[in-house]
C-alpha cells in the first residue's frame, strides 16, 4: 500500500504518494491544479496534475476517463507522456507527466522568436499532429499555452481533455477563440482533424508576427477579423452551415477579397508565407494535412519521412457515447489505472532483465 502525504497548495490539499516531494504550483486550469515535483524514484522533475472532484458528476467523470485513456494511448515524442497515475484516499485523481520548463505562450510574450526556432517549433507541432490525427484523435483546443517547451527546444502538445473522436457530427463550442477554426464557428456540427491545422496556422502566424493573428472580442468580431484577411468564405463552405441564424449572419456580411498574406507579414520568409497560405484555408477539405505540411519546403531543414511516425492503432472511442452513472465511470477508471500499473511493472521487469534501470 502506497504511503500518502498531504500538502496545501493555494488552499488546495494535494494528497500524493511519498514518491513525490518539493511540490511547487506551476499552473491552474479549469479542471485541476498543476504542481512541479521531484520524483524520488527517478530523480527527475515531473508535473503533478490534480483533477478536482473527478467523481462529482457523470460529465466530469467521463471527461477525466477520456483524458486518462488518451494519455495512456498516445505515445509520441511531441505529445506529453504519462509517467504515473493514482487515486488518493480522498478519491482525487492525479496524473504525473514529464515537466517541461515553459510553454509557447510564455515564450511568445517574452521575446520575438528567431526563424530557426519558428521552423523547429512548427515542425514539432505538425509532427505531433500527424501522429495524433492518425490515431483518430482531434485535439480541438490547440493554443500556445498547451504547447510545452523545454530548454533544449523539445516541444510537446498537452491538455487532451477536450479531444474528441474524428466524427462527422462533432459538437460546438470548445477551443480558445483566437485559434478556433471557422467551421467550428459556422457549422457547429461537422468538423474533423483540420480544425487543429487551422489552430496550428494561427500559432505559426503568431510566432512570425509576435502577436495573435485573429484576436476577436467575440464570435462575430472574430469572424469579421478572419474575413478581413482571408476574404468571404466560398459558397460551397457557406452552404455547409447548419444554423439558419449563422447562415443569415454570414450572408449579410459585405463581400471581401482575400488579402495576400505577404502584405500582412512583410518581413517573413516567402516559404513561411506559402505554408501559412496552405494552413489558413476556409474550406477544411482544401486545408493542408499535417503529413503534407511536414514535407513543405519551409520545413525541409527538419523533415525526415522515416522519423515522422503514425499511431500503430486507432484510439478506441467506444465509450464516448456512453451515458453512465458516476459509480460506473469510477469502476472503469480504477480498471484503467490498474491496467496502467500492470503494463508499467511488466515493462520495468523486462527492462531489468535486459540490464535496464
Curated annotation (Swiss-Prot):
InterPro entries in the cross-refs = Kinase-like_dom_sf, MAP_kinase, MAP_kinase_CS, MAPK_p38-like, MAPK_Sty1/Hog1, Prot_kinase_dom, Protein_kinase_ATP_BS, Ser/Thr_kinase_AS
Entry EC number(s)? 2.7.11.24
Q: Where in the cell is it found?
A: Cytoplasm; Nucleus
Which SUPFAM superfamilies does the record associate with it?
A: Protein kinase-like (PK-like) (SSF56112)
A single GO cellular-component term on record? nucleus
Task: Provide the binding site for ATP.
Answer: 26-34, 49
Name the keywords, alphabetized: Activator, ATP-binding, Cytoplasm, Kinase, Nucleotide-binding, Nucleus, Phosphoprotein, Serine/threonine-protein kinase, Transcription, Transcription regulation, Transferase
Q: Which cofactor does it need?
A: Mg(2+)
Record has Nucleus as a keyword:
yes
Activity regulation here? Activated by tyrosine and threonine phosphorylation.
Which residues form each disulfide bond in the chain? none
- Pfam families in UniProt: Pkinase
Its chief place of residence is cytoplasm
* Modification sites for Phosphothreonine: 171
Family, according to the entry, reads as follows: Belongs to the protein kinase superfamily. Ser/Thr protein kinase family. MAP kinase subfamily. HOG1 sub-subfamily.
Entry's free-text remark on domains: The TXY motif contains the threonine and tyrosine residues whose phosphorylation activates the MAP kinases.
This molecule's function is given as:
Proline-directed serine/threonine-protein kinase involved in a signal transduction pathway that is activated by changes in the osmolarity of the extracellular environment. Controls osmotic regulation of transcription of target genes.
| Protein known as | Mitogen-activated protein kinase Hog1
What are the top taxonomic ranks of the organism?
Answer: Eukaryota, Fungi, Dikarya, Ascomycota, Pezizomycotina
Amino acid at each position: 500500500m502506497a504511503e500518502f502525504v498531504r500538502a496545501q497548495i493555494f488552499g488546495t490539499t494535494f494528497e500524493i504518494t511519498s514518491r513525490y516531494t518539493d511540490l511547487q504550483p506551476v499552473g491552474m486550469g479549469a479542471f485541476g491544479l498543476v504542481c512541479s515535483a521531484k520524483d524520488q524514484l527517478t530523480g527527475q522533475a515531473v508535473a503533478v496534475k490534480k483533477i478536482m472532484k473527478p467523481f462529482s458528476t457523470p460529465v466530469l467523470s467521463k471527461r477525466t476517463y477520456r483524458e486518462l485513456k488518451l494519455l495512456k494511448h498516445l505515445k509520441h515524442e511531441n505529445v506529453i507522456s504519462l509517467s504515473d497515475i493514482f487515486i488518493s484516499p480522498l478519491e482525487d485523481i492525479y496524473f504525473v507527466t514529464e515537466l517541461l520548463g515553459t510553454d509557447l505562450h510564455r515564450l511568445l510574450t517574452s521575446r520575438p522568436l528567431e526563424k530557426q526556432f519558428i521552423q523547429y517549433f512548427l515542425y514539432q507541432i505538425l509532427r505531433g499532429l500527424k501522429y495524433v490525427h492518425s490515431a483518430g484523435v482531434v485535439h480541438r483546443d490547440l493554443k500556445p499555452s498547451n504547447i510545452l517547451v523545454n530548454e533544449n527546444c523539445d516541444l510537446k502538445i498537452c491538455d487532451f481533455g477536450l479531444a474528441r473522436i474524428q466524427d462527422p457530427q462533432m459538437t460546438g463550442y470548445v477551443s480558445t477563440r483566437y485559434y478556433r477554426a471557422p467551421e467550428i464557428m459556422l457549422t457547429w456540427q461537422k468538423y474533423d482533424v483540420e480544425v487543429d491545422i487551422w489552430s496550428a496556422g494561427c500559432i505559426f502566424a503568431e510566432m512570425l508576427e509576435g502577436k495573435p493573428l485573429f484576436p476577436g472580442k467575440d464570435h462575430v468580431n472574430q469572424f469579421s477579423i478572419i474575413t478581413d484577411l482571408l476574404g468571404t468564405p466560398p459558397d460551397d463552405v457557406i452552404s455547409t452551415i447548419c444554423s439558419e441564424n449563422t447562415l443569415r449572419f454570414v450572408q449579410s456580411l459585405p463581400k471581401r477579397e482575400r488579402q495576400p498574406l505577404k502584405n500582412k507579414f512583410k518581413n517573413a520568409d516567402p516559404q513561411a508565407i506559402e505554408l501559412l497560405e496552405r494552413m489558413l484555408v476556409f474550406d477544411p477539405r482544401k486545408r493542408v494535412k499535417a503529413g503534407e505540411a511536414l514535407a513543405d519546403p519551409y520545413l525541409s531543414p527538419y523533415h525526415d519521412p522515416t522519423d515522422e511516425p503514425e499511431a500503430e492503432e486507432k484510439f478506441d472511442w467506444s465509450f464516448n457515447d456512453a451515458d453512465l452513472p458516476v459509480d460506473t465511470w469510477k469502476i472503469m477508471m480504477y480498471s484503467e489505472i490498474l491496467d496502467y500499473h500492470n503494463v508499467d511493472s511488466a515493462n520495468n521487469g523486462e527492462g531489468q532483465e535486459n540490464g535496464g534501470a
